[in-house]
Design a protein with these regions (language model features):
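Noncatalytic, solvent-exposed loop/strand surfaces
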Residues: 1-271
């Protein structure tokens, strides 16, 4: 099982499998080290298997295990030294989520605010920010499951642009928060919310425009700062859309499960 994507620092490559095997390789394919996360910390308990990719920052890999559907074990965040595979810390991430809602298939991301860097994690009906040096939780945003749906797992990952954190959930709500908060930022740092977000594909933003494509190929463009709808809903070729859109050179590349790529202009008009 290889749902997670590999990451590289340009010198080595790091791979996490769906069965919890985390390895480092050089570019010649030589294995540098290996860790078995399930052996070290217990079996994963996600309903659909493990799928979060590791986050690479500075000298470390950050690995989230957010689960609950098939386990009573706590969710946690790990920091692993990229050169040796040695664990540097493990912190638990408690939430009140129940049944399948603790499960998260997202990948953590970074947010930079002024001179500070934080690890952003979504899942378990909330979003948290962590100190990359210690793992300490710095802030938390709640309200990700307003209907208390016991099956409100999250698949689409958070994204960051211009110090704004965009956090999708299971379609709704998709919320945008300004960075720099401490403690409970659920209301104090909330910028806007959107009720037509994706389930599986992660959104993308260039800081000016925010683009979202849902599982049915319905595309939207919002003002990244205010959440105002610029265009959408616009239907792409009917199919299932699971891959996240890619933004490059002023264009938005969207691939569906039939292998068709749609290229859109990444701007205020749908074309």
């Amino acid at each position: 099982m290889s749902s997670p994507s590999p990451v590289t620092d340009g010198l080595n490559v790091y791979v996490m499998t769906g069965t919890g095997i985390l390895k480092g390789f050089d570019f010649a394919g030589k294995e540098l080290w290996v860790r078995d996360i399930q052996q070290d910390y217990g079996k994963f308990g996600l309903n659909w298997g493990y799928a979060s990719s590791p986050l690479l920052y500075s000298d470390s890999l950050y690995v989230q295990v957010l689960h609950g559907m098939k386990t009573d074990a706590p969710s946690y965040l790990l920091r692993i030294h990229k050169k040796t595979g040695r664990p540097l810390w493990k912190v638990e991430r408690p939430t009140p989520a129940i049944t399948e809602s603790p499960d998260s298939y997202t990948t953590p991301t970074l947010v930079r605010h002024s001179a500070e860097v934080e690890i952003v994690v979504t899942g378990g009906d909330c979003m948290t920010g962590h100190d990359p040096e210690t793992g300490k939780e710095l802030w938390r945003a709640n309200g990700f499951n307003p209907d208390n749906d016991p099956f409100h797992r999250i698949i689409a990952s958070p994204v960051v642009a211009d110090e704004i954190i965009y956090a999708p959930t299971k379609v709704r709500p998709l919320m945008a928060f300004r960075s720099g908060g401490r403690g409970d930022i659920s209301q104090s740092h909330l910028l806007w919310s959107f009720q037509n977000g994706p389930d599986v594909p992660s959104p993308v933003s260039d800081g000016k425009y925010f683009f979202s494509v849902n599982d049915k190929g319905i595309a939207w463009c919002l003002d990244a700062k205010t959440g105002k709808e610029i265009w959408g809903p616009q239907r792409l070729t009917p199919a299932i859309y699971s891959a996240s859109p890619v933004l490059a050179n002023g264009k938005l590349y969207v691939i569906n499960e039939e292998g068709l790529t749609t290229v859109l202009k990444a701007g205020p008009t749908f074309e």
